[in-house]
């Protein structure tokens, strides 16, 4: 395939060229605990030439009475990091973010594990999401909320296991064609009600996961 040929090309390049094939290496099955074939990214200081290291960001260094990680609350964005497939306006997806899942719910579960693994390796304490980032919409509001109810406990379990926090949650009120005229501004009462139900569910999930804000 074109992607496999591109991977072979990147593997022949030294330095930063090694990053792409490394990041795209994923493992199969839920019994495998590692999705990204990289180690934890350490702080090595300004003189480091290691592309897999921090040169300026030292998370536990205290500045003005607070650790860097408390001043700079970096957050993993679920949609860009775990869902976006690299599509641009004139092309198709170039990144496979299914993590070897075979159906939408299996993919959603894989993404949860991949999320917390990557947060650990990058030293990120927070994450954030839209509702449809973490679970598939399905064919109805009932199915969407059922899918969320299955995935959210897994997220909570992983948060507790890895000591991570939710910075904020929100509802995606733009990705589905039903929102062609907006959500709260829609001229269709059914669309308005659907949006309200999405928001209510997303707020409940955010509160349940101890989110620090709702967007």
Q: For the regions a protein language model found, what residue spans apply to each?
A:
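Short, positively charged and aromatic/hydrophobic N-terminal segments
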Residues: 8-11, 18-28
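N-terminal pre-domain/capping segments
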Residues: 27-213
């Amino acid at each position: 395939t074109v992607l496999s040929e591109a991977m072979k090309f990147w593997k022949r390049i030294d330095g930063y060229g090694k990053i792409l094939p490394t990041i795209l290496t994923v493992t199969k099955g839920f019994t495998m605990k590692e999705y990204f074939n990289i180690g934890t990214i350490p702080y090595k200081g300004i003189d480091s030439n290691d592309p897999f290291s921090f040169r300026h960001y030292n998370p536990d260094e205290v500045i003005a009475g607070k650790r860097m990680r408390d001043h700079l609350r970096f957050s993993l964005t679920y949609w860009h990091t775990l869902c976006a497939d690299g599509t641009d306006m004139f092309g198709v997806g170039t990144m496979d973010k299914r993590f070897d899942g075979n159906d939408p719910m299996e993919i959603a579960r894989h993404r949860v594990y991949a999320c917390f693994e990557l947060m650990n390796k990058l030293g990120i304490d927070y994450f954030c999401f839209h509702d449809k980032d973490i679970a598939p919409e399905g064919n109805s509001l009932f199915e969407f909320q059922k899918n969320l109810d299955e995935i959210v406990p897994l997220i909570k379990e992983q948060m507790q296991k890895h000591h991570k926090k939710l910075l904020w949650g929100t509802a995606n009120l733009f990705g589905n064609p039903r929102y062609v005229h907006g959500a709260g501004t829609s001229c269709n009462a059914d669309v308005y009600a659907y949006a309200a139900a999405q928001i209510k569910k997303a707020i409940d999930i955010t509160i349940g996961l101890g989110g620090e804000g709702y967007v």
